[in-house]
Amino acid sequence: MMELKFDKIGNVLKITVDGRLVAACSEEFKETVSGWLADNRFLLFDLSQMNHIDSSGLGALVYVLQKANAQDGSAKLACLQPRPRIVFDITKVYRIFEIFDSVDAALASFGTEAK
């Protein structure tokens, strides 16, 4: 089960993913986040509460990243936990995302463009 929490910080939409981002909820994730992309080009995914991800979940994150990039925006990740990090490492998906150790570091990386 997955829950999403949305917080606007300046021009950045912080999305906290709580639980498991897996096949059973990946389509819902894509639809929900895509809906928010209409008004928010800069996304920050706080993954501190995400305890599991599978290939469908990775695909959903990549999909959102591509949509954000197509709108001259960006999607960044923060607080990736050890178990999901293994999936990122094995698949080498970490190469296409900016991943930060903290939400504050990720927010700072958006710079003045997102303020």
Summary of predicted features, one role per range:
Residues M1-L4, K30-T32, D54, L107:
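Short low-complexity stretches enriched in small and charged residues
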Residues A23-F97:
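Amphipathic alpha-helical interaction surfaces in cytosolic regulatory modules
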Residues E3-E31, S48:
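STAS-typified acidic loop motif
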Residues S102-K115:
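A charged, well-structured terminal subsegment
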Residues G19, Q81, V103:
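Short, flexible active-site-adjacent loop segments at beta-strand->alpha-helix junctions, enriched
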